[in-house]
Regions:
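Short, structured "edge-of-domain" segments at secondary-structure transitions
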Residues: 1-284
């Protein structure tokens, strides 16, 4: 639907699914897999894939509120697919205020229709993202002001389901966490982190440039943020052979190759990935 463009293109108006909605996630799974929906309020809901309404490729689909008993303005932040809820491994959680939590997957086996508390949140905090790990991954938290901290996941000891977590990154001023990346053991030598900013700039930086340190520090510069770049919107691991979809607040989207985004050091502003109009900003 979105023709690939060279880096630095203008993008195109996103094709809206319904009510100004756009497609933001595609998961591959078996009909017997579970889908887990984690929300900004720190709750998790569960559905079997075979219980979801079946539709053809061009169908608009059902609104998430027709599937899950979300409350008020509760929104889904992460969707994960799992074959078994008693599987080995961990869920790693990151919150807006810099907390990190690691809990065994099997602690979430008894999710009811009404959902379950996945992480306790204090007033003013919200869940940003959840990832699955095997216990040996490195974790990287990225912030709106371009800071990043890398630490081993076992630096956050595993805790029970209804717990708050511990400090992952110590934030300055009004900074907030915008992304959570986990890098498996086998990818640590070759991994790169892709960072994107509100003005449409981006770069790839080798994971090795992010020093491994203990959790709870202030981290290092992951992307040099200025008035020209705008805030950082994401910091995510890439291999270099993927395609990138970048979306703005006004519904403009560009599709390009990650390999066209230049590789650069941590403390740089990156290259123009997308031309963003005045008054608009990249959001993902």
């Amino acid at each position: 639907a979105y023709r690939a463009q060279a880096r630095g293109g203008k993008g195109a108006k996103a094709q809206l699914a319904k009510d100004d909605d756009i497609n933001s996630l595609l998961l591959v799974g078996s009909t017997h897999d579970y889908l887990l929906f984690f929300t900004d309020r720190g709750r998790v809901y569960r559905e079997k894939i075979y219980d979801l309404p079946e539709a053809d490729r061009a169908a608009r689909g059902s609104h998430i509120r027709n599937l899950l008993p979300l409350v008020d303005d509760e929104s889904v932040q992460t969707v994960l697919s799992l074959r078994n809820l008693d599987a080995d491994g961990y869920f790693v959680f990151a919150t807006r205020n810099g907390l990190i939590k690691r809990t065994l997957i099997r602690d979430y086996v008894n999710i009811t229709i009404a959902g379950l508390v996945a992480i306790n949140l204090v007033d003013g905090d919200e869940l940003v993202a959840v990832r699955i790990t095997d216990g040996s991954a490195d974790v990287v938290l990225g912030t709106r002001k371009g800071q990043a901290i890398r630490f081993q996941e076992d630096g956050a000891r595993d805790t029970g389901r209804a717990t708050q977590g511990v400090i992952g990154i110590r934030l300055k001023g009004d900074d907030t966490v915008v992304s959570l990346a986990v890098i498996p053991e086998e990818e640590k030598q070759s991994a790169e982190l892709l960072s994107l900013t509100e003005s449409g700039r981006g770069k790839r930086t080798r994971l090795s440039e992010f020093p491994l340190q203990g959790r709870g520090g202030q981290g290092v510069i992951g992307h040099k943020v200025t008035s020209k770049t705008g805030d950082m919107v994401t910091l995510t691991p890439v291999r270099g052979d993927e395609e990138l979809l970048m979306l703005t607040n006004q519904g403009i989207i560009i599709r390009t190759s990650v390999s066209q985004v230049g590789s650069d050091g941590r403390s740089t502003q990156g290259v123009k990935v997308m031309r963003v109009d005045d008054g608009d900003r990249a959001v993902a």
